[in-house]
Amino acid sequence: MWRLLTRMPGVGFDAVQGPAQAHAAASLLARFHSALDDLEHAFVGLRSGVHDTPAHLARLAQVVDELPRHRLHAPVARLAEAIAARAAELPALHGLPARVVHGDPKLNNILFESAEPPGCERPLCLVDLDTVAPMPLPLELGDALRSWCNPRGEDERVARFDGATHDAAIAGYLAACTLALAPDERAALLHGVEWITLELSARFAADALREQYFGWDRTRFPAAGEHNLVRAEGQWSLHEQVFAARPQRALALRGVPGAAPPSSSGAAR
C-alpha cells in the first residue's frame, strides 16, 4: 500500500543554522502539537518501546554481562556504569499525559522556504509523519533539543551543547504553544533532554557490543562497534553538558511566552 501526499517544495537542513532558525523551528513544532491537541485517533503500527528508557538501560546492562570478551567491553562497561549512576539521579518522568507528537523532530524533518536568510528562518511544514504517535511532551521536546543543540552531530566523541540555540528554541516553543500544560508536565520539560541523551548513549553503547542495529561509516571506523562507541561517548558528552547547564536551561523555561525571536544576524552563513 502506498500513501500519496501533496509535494511540499522546500529545503531541509542537517544542522541548525543559528538561533533564529531554532526559534522558528520550535515555533512550528509547538503549533503542530497544539493543532493536534484534540485529535481522537486510534493509531496503528506504533513503534513499540520508543523512548522506554528503563528498557534501554536494562538492555545495556544485559549486553555488558553477556559479552565480556568483546574487544570494546572495557570502555562500554565503564560508560554503562556512569549511565546507570546518572539515571538513578534524574527525576522520573512517570504519570505524564501522552500527547500526539511528531515522534522524530530532528531538523531535517522540517522544510524551510530556502537555503539562505530570511527563507531559512521560515519553516513550511514537518515531514516524515510515520512516527506521529502519543508520547509525553518532555520526551518529544527533549529529542528535538538533543538534535538541534549539538552542532557537532552524532558522530563525534565530544559534543558541544549550544546554549543560545537551546534558549532560542525554548522561547519559540513557549511563544507558540497553546497546550494547557499541568505544572508537573511543564516542570518535566527541563529533564526531557537529559533523559533522551542518556537513553541514546545507552542504545549506542549496547550496539557497540552487539554490532547489529545501527549502520556505520566504513571510511572512518574499522567496524560498527568502534563507530557506535564514539556515538555513545558523544551522547554522554552532550548529556554531561546539558546536565551541567540545568540552571541556565531552567531560566529559559521560565521565559515569558511571546518573547521576540533572536536576530537573524546570528544565523550561520
List each language-model region with its residue ranges:
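A conserved loop-to-beta-strand element in the N-lobe of protein kinase catalytic cores
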Residues: 1-5
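ATP-dependent phospho-/nucleotidyl transfer catalytic cores
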Residues: 8-23, 38-103, 107, 111-122, ...
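Helix-to-catalytic-loop junction in kinase catalytic cores
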Residues: 33
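Activation of the activation-loop gatekeeper triad in protein kinase-fold domains
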Residues: 127-132
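Active-site activation/catalytic loop segments of kinase-like enzymes and analogous catalytic loops
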Residues: 138-179, 195-214
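All-alpha amphipathic helical-bundle segments outside canonical DNA-binding/catalytic cores
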Residues: 181-193
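ATP/Mg2+ or Mg2+-diphosphate-binding catalytic cores
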Residues: 199-269
